Curated annotation (Swiss-Prot):
Gene, per the UniProt record: ATP2A2
Region (Interaction with PLN): 787-807, 931-942
UniProt activity-regulation remark: Has different conformational states with differential Ca2+ affinity. The E1 conformational state (active form) shows high Ca(2+) affinity, while the E2 state exhibits low Ca(2+) affinity. Binding of ATP allosterically increases its affinity for subsequent binding of Ca2+. Reversibly inhibited by phospholamban (PLN) at low calcium concentrations. PLN inhibits ATP2A2 Ca(2+) affinity by disrupting its allosteric activation by ATP. Inhibited by sarcolipin (SLN) and myoregulin (MRLN). The inhibition is blocked by VMP1.
Name by which UniProt lists this protein: Sarcoplasmic/endoplasmic reticulum calcium ATPase 2
Consequence of substituting residue 318 to R: In DD; severe form
Amino acid sequence: MENAHTKTVEEVLGHFGVNESTGLSLEQVKKLKERWGSNELPAEEGKTLLELVIEQFEDLLVRILLLAACISFVLAWFEEGEETITAFVEPFVILLILVANAIVGVWQERNAENAIEALKEYEPEMGKVYRQDRKSVQRIKAKDIVPGDIVEIAVGDKVPADIRLTSIKSTTLRVDQSILTGESVSVIKHTDPVPDPRAVNQDKKNMLFSGTNIAAGKAMGVVVATGVNTEIGKIRDEMVATEQERTPLQQKLDEFGEQLSKVISLICIAVWIINIGHFNDPVHGGSWIRGAIYYFKIAVALAVAAIPEGLPAVITTCLALGTRRMAKKNAIVRSLPSVETLGCTSVICSDKTGTLTTNQMSVCRMFILDRVEGDTCSLNEFTITGSTYAPIGEVHKDDKPVNCHQYDGLVELATICALCNDSALDYNEAKGVYEKVGEATETALTCLVEKMNVFDTELKGLSKIERANACNSVIKQLMKKEFTLEFSRDRKSMSVYCTPNKPSRTSMSKMFVKGAPEGVIDRCTHIRVGSTKVPMTSGVKQKIMSVIREWGSGSDTLRCLALATHDNPLRREEMHLEDSANFIKYETNLTFVGCVGMLDPPRIEVASSVKLCRQAGIRVIMITGDNKGTAVAICRRIGIFGQDEDVTSKAFTGREFDELNPSAQRDACLNARCFARVEPSHKSKIVEFLQSFDEITAMTGDGVNDAPALKKAEIGIAMGSGTAVAKTASEMVLADDNFSTIVAAVEEGRAIYNNMKQFIRYLISSNVGEVVCIFLTAALGFPEALIPVQLLWVNLVTDGLPATALGFNPPDLDIMNKPPRNPKEPLISGWLFFRYLAIGCYVGAATVGAAAWWFIAADGGPRVSFYQLSHFLQCKEDNPDFEGVDCAIFESPYPMTMALSVLVTIEMCNALNSLSENQSLLRMPPWENIWLVGSICLSMSLHFLILYVEPLPLIFQITPLNVTQWLMVLKISLPVILMDETLKFVARNYLEPGKECVQPATKSCSFSACTDGISWPFVLLIMPLVIWVYSTDTNFSDMFWS
């Protein structure tokens, strides 16, 4: 039934043709069940395991690897001789990587679907209904309830469907609907129509929603919606319809894979075409087909060299390390790619209650009357420190602490707060914090009584458990609570009838009242001044109400409660308590005692975090279910709005937002920083608009109602105290529910992206070097310098360790002083691409050069000419060009070992270059990242392992090197550091101004100024090594002059 909240009880019952006392007939139930189906959320049909596995191979980079593995496998199958076994290593390792990658992908996909299934925990199993086949109420399975059923609900029940209340059988009916609406306190319901057809769920006071809990009272109602038609069902549909967007990193890696695949294809085809003239060489037995297959194998090796096989593993490891660091800061990351997405977050949409605020109501101001003269009066105003439930704080007057027992008015005010109250404080030993037991508002009053300590109770020596309610206990020992007149909407107050525990002539029964100021003060005839009471005049009443209005609408927007006493109430026997309509009669002729102002205070650290966000170019938007006045006031206190800032076009209620046309809604999302009184659909709509501006949005939430928006946003952030649905729909969970934790996570995300750029640069320059090496050997006609199994070893193991260690690079000091990076900016800029290419070309040339040095100039080498080396395929005994040359020498493992050792060593130097994007090694020495130093040592150890431990040299087709050969390796490798230092110098001083303080051109740079910040221990360590390496003769120059 549409808009059931706007209809009268009679209209709703008439619509379903049902009587409240008898319920539906079995015939009606049958028809309605056929029409509306079962009252349950349908199980989500997830993807099959096969579909999920196939999905993992849709990535372009993965498909290229798969193709390379298949071709390698086919070629290995037809391999002859000793290389048969080693030929299978390459396809096997590639397939192993792909399988591991697929397993991780499938596992993450499976986890994502759990969010929809978690909604089922809010479906009650049973319901109580009235039907015509039985005279009394009957319990049936909740899934068998149909629209039109008359349902009975009572305290502790979970609401089985969306219900329009028809009658309330208790004084009040309170419902905890926080999981659906986000309201932090239970809501009082009634049966009157709510005439507004566009009312938000919070304002539908005559409706109960499926999955919410009855906090107090008993009532009956008619079911108006079941299953997917309920409000929780609509949330489920929205979640099903929400497609998960790919993270910026995933998009960048996809683009990178596409570019890489095109480059690889072009180079492979080029290598194959360049060598067409060699297809008929004698070494191939004169067979054109065998020559074509040989160069096809080289092209496949090139593909393997060009693909950074280790990249997926290193990225996963880096993100996993990032999640561990975030977990220490109370941010638990559920989705690995979202770690990096946090780094480019440009908008944070945050809940108010519990995230920006403590979600711990506390009294911060109160007043009593000081003196009254006719229509004029003066007040004693007090402020209270402490913003949590801990019973620690002071009462101040004019910024000076006071003893509350010196004020008679405060003693009575504390008595009312303690007795007109069903809440208590509890010390949680496991968490080490004080928590509320009962309503938040009443707990704030309990905490106030503890801070006031009006009877000077001795508190020293008490345990924290005993301290929790020590002062309240003293008051409760003096007065005994006889009964309570429950809160009702019409009088907006509640009261307790108390008698003294030790009756005397002077102490008599009293009634203590608390409630909304306008309701209570209207029924007050007197005012308490000290220990006396004086009549209340209109002038005094006006003064009191003006102060209360100021508190309620000022910068704090306090929630005010008036406290009053009935000094001579009727005796209990004279009261008719069965009918709550009589309560207002007993709460008249009251004496006004004082007023308290409370609020859910902002967290202490939030203001500085909001300021940090502003510095970092991140817009913070508060989205709350609370009213607009309170929301704007909190925004001003934490710095989202300035103290005097005009919020006309920057703060909207859900209703105001809906009334705007689409263009105005778009502008609102572009400028607004506060949305109040919102529903779940508003959150999703706001996220959609923000995404249309290419903003990267982080959205917080804790209730079932937040799940669709959490799933839609790039970063869904659930509260640690939130529902299972919210947690499973999110990418990150805040263990401490604190906004400042989000900002710390954003900072970590930015650092991770910077480090990721460094290790991607490191791995790609390595792969470019390998491609250049294979391309040069093919183009020059040299023997193979590197084979696929060696390339795999370098890409996965030797390079993988330093790349992972680069994830530990320290973050830049100004990381939160820069605006968020554009998620569309390429992973590799033009300048970075040039750097990759320049370094990569040197790596490739150095690797080929090392192999050539052994052939041409090494003491233990064959010392062939350049012509003989580049035409080695024509080597035969009867060829005069190769007279005196043993053709078997061209298959020696030494040149391969030299090439592989240079590649590994040069990559270790390159890892040192990657310590910082633009900072010199002289100013940022290797020990700035001790993990990198350790990983370089481990990588070199693994290289020595495959060189010197049998049978590994046989598998990798290499052989041990002597000292001279190692000196040559160092001589060829070290210049890469000098080369990158030059490129860094250019970037620092010419391409990225402002990163370092440049001396004005007019001033000469003194030696001390130029050398400022240089790490002299590093200089002293490295210089002797460089001098020794380059002063030792290794016949290096012979290679060029021979």
